Structures are given as C-alpha cells and as structure tokens.
Amino acid sequence: MRRNDLLNNKITIFLSSLSLFVIIIPIYAAEKDLLPPSTSSETFLTDEDFLRPLNDDETFLTEKDFKNGEKLGEDHVPAGSILWKQVYKKGDIRGKAAWKLDPKNSESLRRNGVITGTRKWPNGRIPYVISNQYNDRERAVLARSFQAYHDKTCVRFVPRTAVDNDYLYIGKIDGCYSDVGRAGGRQELSLDNGCLQYDTAIHELMHSVGFYHEHERWDRDEHITILWHNIDREAYDQFGKVDLAESSYYGQLYDYYSIMHYDSLAFSKNGFETMVAKQSEMTAVIGAAIDFSPIDILKMNLMYQCSDVKLPPTVVGTTDKTIVPVPAPSVTVVEDDCRDRTNLCWRWIDRCKSFFFEQIMKEFCSLSCGYCTPKALQTAKASPPNYSNTLLTKSSTSYLQHG
C-alpha cells in the first residue's frame, strides 16, 4: 500500500512540473515578442534597464559624475612625468601586452598603434565597470576623461551589459597601468592613489584604446637619442621599439607633444636624462603634455575610422548615492630651486597631494610631485640632481613610509 502511495506521489509531482513547464513556454515567447521588431536582443540589452548586475565592489559613472567633471579645476600633473615614477621599473603597460613585450620572449618588439582587428574594440565601443573605492572627486576625474574621448573621437566608454564578455575594470589596483587594446575578458586598468589626474587618466585610457608610447616608435632614433648609460638596467625594456609588421603610425610624424610620450628623465638611475630630442628645444616638451595633442586625436580617429563608424549611444549607470562636488586641491608652485632633495621620491609619489604629507613632499620632492613652474622645470632638467638624504630625518622617513 505504501509503495502505491509513493508511486502516485511521484506521478503527481511529474504532472505538476510538466504543467508548469507548459505554462512557462508561452510566457517566455510572449515576453520575447515585446522586443521592438527592428531591435535585436543584443542591442536591446544595451538600454540602461538591462545593464549587467554589478558585483558589490563595482559601479558605473552617472550623469552627476559627468556634471561634476565639468566643474573640476586645472589639477594637471604632467602624465609623462608622473607615470614612470609611479610604476618605477615596471612601466605602465601590463597584462597580455606586457607579456608580449617581455625581453625574455622572442616576440618582444613593441608597437605604437595596434592594427590587428582582434585588439581593437568593435565600433569603438568600450564596456567598463569601475571600483566603488573612488570618491566623488575621483569619479569626476574619470567622467571628465571619458568625456574627452566622447567629444574628440568616436570611441565610447559605456557601462558593461549582460552580453559584454570583454570589458575594462577600472580600479585602485597597483599604481597606474593598463593593457593595450582589447585583451579579452576582464581587463584591468589601474588608477590608484597618485594616478587620479585628468592627464594621467587619459594616458592610461589611450593604452586601452590601442596605443603604446610615442618614444617606442620604430623611427624614434631619428627624433630622440636614448642615453642608455643613464637608464636603470631593469628598465631597459621600457625603451623597446615598435614592430612595423603589426603597427601603424597612420601617416603621422613623430609627436613630441603626445600625451603618450614619457619625459626626458624616465627611468633614470642617477637623475640625469635618459632621452633627449634631436631638436634640443623639444627635450623640455616631451612628457609635459596635459591633454591630447592634435596628432593623438587624429590617430585615434583614423584607427577607428570615425568618419564611417556608427556611434553607439552614451549610456550612464545609476546609483542611489548622493554626489557632492569636491573642489580640486590647490597646488603651491615652487618658484626657485625646484628639485628633489632625496632620491626616494619615486617611492612616495602617491603622497604628493595627501592632506597629511603635502608639506613634506613640497619640501623634499617638489620636482617629482609637479610643483615646478615650466621655467623652473626646464632648469631642473638641465641640472644634475642635488640629493641630500641626510635632510630627511629617520622620523620623517618612517612617517612617509608608514604614516
């Protein structure tokens, strides 16, 4: 008897499940029919309501962030100067691109602008998510950087959707770095403390768009001289040259004004210049850009064929957090002797604008922190360093390292 009861129960459960399945099918079909007839399911999912569910540590930029970005002050620190100090010896290119450029690999030639289709973002559309670690002002810097691409190119940074397997994750990971072009899957772009300036951000984003550094062009020896005896041996790979078989300059001349050019002291082991321009007056120019050069903009538009591409809509995310604009901190410029007074500044570059360390950094690392006027900067570059590490007391050093 008990056996028959069990059998009857199983039959009842099976029939109930079957009935539920039969009911679900027409509901699913009806919902699918709700899509506009001219819209595929993929493009329909790009609408804000269908943005991919975020992890707890991820978010998007909002309209308020973009409005706050318009209100930012001129907080520029020349990107070419700060980047190589922030990422000392490792450089700011990592991920698959960095592996390919490892001198231990046989394929270690660098490229200026990728030309292989697999490394470009389809239609210039770059899906992203950002870390929720960024404060209001940092989010505004990111928004302002995105908007610069939206205004000057057809590249669009858009919130990641459910169908975007390849995307940027922008977060405070480890200094300032990016992969080059579309690497596939989750692609990290690090903008850590010390990297959240507009010019640094657009530099790293231009890597993700698909460009290497300007001083790595194959023809760079016609325009700059590399002073190998001043370069730290572990940083030699930062001065590789491009592979013409896989790259293109898009018909453009060497660009001393590029946001992608490092400065003349990059990866110096002794404080002396590591590269100088063949046109001597250009040595002070390289690495001093605070925005895209006209050639930077032209090359990006040529890479993505912007005159023909169908621009995807700009979609912003949503958040319940109230955003309050935070004014950019003021920077005091050191007028006279603008030099680093210790050779340890590269270790503490992220403390340059810290509320607690700013005065110490102005005193001992004015050059590295970007507190020089253009005239003082040119004088400092032309002079050997004057390090006096004894000026840093043990307590000051400990405070900077652990405070």
Curated annotation (Swiss-Prot):
Q: Which cysteines are joined by disulfide bonds?
A: C154-C306, C176-C195, C338-C372, C345-C365, C352-C369
PROSITE patterns attached here?
ASTACIN, SHKT, ZINC_PROTEASE
Propeptide stretches in the record:
30-111
* Protein function: Metalloprotease.
- SUPFAM superfamilies xrefs: Metalloproteases ('zincins'), catalytic domain
Which residues catalyse the reaction? Answer: E204
Question: Residues in domain ShKT?
Answer: 338-372
Point out the signal peptide segment. Answer: 1-29
The cofactor note reads: Binds 1 zinc ion per subunit.
Q: Which cofactor does it need?
A: Zn(2+)
What are the annotated glycosylation sites? N386
EC numbers listed for it are 3.4.24.21
Q: Which reaction does it catalyse?
A: Hydrolysis of peptide bonds in substrates containing five or more amino acids, preferentially with Ala in P1', and Pro in P2'
Family annotation (InterPro entries): Astacin-like_dom, Caenorhab_nas-7/8, MetalloPept_cat_dom_sf, Peptidase_M12A, Peptidase_Metallo, ShKT_dom
Species the sequence originates in: Caenorhabditis elegans
Q: Where in the cell is it found?
A: Secreted
UniProt xrefs under Pfam families: Astacin, ShK
| Binding residues for Zn(2+) | H203, H207, H213
Sorted keywords for this record are: Cleavage on pair of basic residues, Disulfide bond, Glycoprotein, Hydrolase, Metal-binding, Metalloprotease, Protease, Secreted, Signal, Zinc, Zymogen
Q: What is this protein called?
A: Zinc metalloproteinase nas-8
Q: In the UniProt record, which is one GO cellular component term?
A: extracellular region
Q: Report a single Gene Ontology molecular function.
A: zinc ion binding
On the tree of life, the source organism's domain of life is Eukaryota
Question: Any one Gene Ontology biological process term?
Answer: proteolysis
In the UniProt record, what gene is named as encoding this protein? nas-8
In this protein, which residues make up the domain named Peptidase M12A?
112-307
